[in-house]
Amino acid sequence: MEAEKQSDIKGTIAFDTHGNVIESTGVGSQRIEDIGDLSKVTLDAEGFAQVQGDSLLVHLYKRNDITLAVYTSAQ
């Protein structure tokens, strides 16, 4: 993904309400097991949330039945 090369995005995962992966990139491809935990995160009224991981931040956005997780550096 070209945007990843020009930003601090380390990877992404897009998944549906059943935990099926729609697309993954970068470290997201190696963190598919995160889907179970990420799908339980409480989102705000607009469908956003942020989760601090070990060395990564995970930015979540859900619209309809699709959730997008964007992994960035936790710096």
Swiss-Prot record:
One family name in Pfam for this protein: YNR034W-A-like
Effect of loss of the gene: Sensitive to high hydrostatic pressure (mechanical stress).
Alphabetical list of InterPro entries matching this protein: YNR034W-A/EGO2, YNR034W-A/EGO2_sf
Disulfide bonds: none
GO cellular component: fungal-type vacuole membrane; Ragulator complex
Database matches in SUPFAM superfamilies: YNR034W-A-like (SSF160683)
GO biological process terms held by the UniProt record: microautophagy; positive regulation of TOR signaling; protein localization to vacuole; TORC1 signaling
Protein name: Protein EGO2
